[in-house]
């Protein structure tokens, strides 16, 4: 049996695959520009169990990275990435917040621009 959290994460991976971004299902050592990183949000799981069936809402951070090449192009790339990803979020997932683009240092590899999208979905055991 696959965990409900795993099912939820993999549904997002499937939705984002083919959009032109490298999709990471866990935190990479070094995120590349033009990628999507899916990680647990806080809270990660909010239970709502009634009876014996497992039932909860799971929350994810979808972090989009783009190259910081120059300010104008990076801003446009971030805006286009957000629109593309929001359109690809499947039903019944909801997005609750989109953070502003920000420079993120990734060590010796330099910096990337990251934008955080918060999504959630209710999962129920069959």
Task: List PLM regions with ranges.
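Charged, amphipathic alpha-helical segments and their flanking helix caps
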Residues: 1-31, 42-126
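A short glycine-rich, His/Asp/Glu-containing loop-to-beta-strand
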Residues: 34-37
């Amino acid at each position: 049996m696959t965990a409900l959290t795993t099912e939820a994460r993999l549904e997002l991976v499937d939705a984002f695959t083919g959009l032109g971004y490298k999709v990471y299902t866990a935190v990479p050592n070094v995120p590349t520009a033009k990628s999507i990183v899916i990680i647990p949000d806080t809270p990660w799981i909010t239970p709502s169990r009634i009876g014996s069936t497992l039932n909860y809402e799971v929350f994810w951070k979808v972090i989009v990275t783009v190259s910081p090449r120059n300010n104008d192009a990076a801003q446009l790339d971030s805006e286009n990435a957000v629109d593309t990803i929001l359109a690809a979020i499947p039903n019944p997932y909801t997005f609750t917040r989109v953070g502003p683009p920000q420079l993120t240092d990734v060590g010796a590899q330099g910096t990337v621009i990251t934008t955080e999208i918060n999504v959630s979905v209710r999962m129920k055991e069959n």
